[in-house]
Amino acid sequence: MNPIVEFCISNMAKGGDYVYNKLDQDPGVDVLEYGCLQNCGVCSSGLYALVNGDIVEGDSPDDLLQNIYKHIEETWIF
């Protein structure tokens, strides 16, 4: 079982698509895209993704990618 990273399509238009594509190439991560993740406040203020249900944010696409991997490393139990 892999960690699951979920993206909102609106947030992908802000640079999240770069992160999505990078993670999609990683066989150790499952990546999903949704029309909306119901986190409009976070989504409107910057880049974010849900990592196993937890909100992870970043100031730039590279920062978000780094924060996602850090979150997985710190919280993943499998």
From Swiss-Prot:
Q: Which domain of life is it from?
A: Bacteria
Pfam families referenced in this protein's UniProt entry, alphabetically: DUF1450 (PF07293)
Coiled coil feature spans: none
Q: So what family is this one in?
A: Belongs to the UPF0349 family.
Q: What is this protein called?
A: UPF0349 protein Sca_0544
Species of origin:
Staphylococcus carnosus (strain TM300)
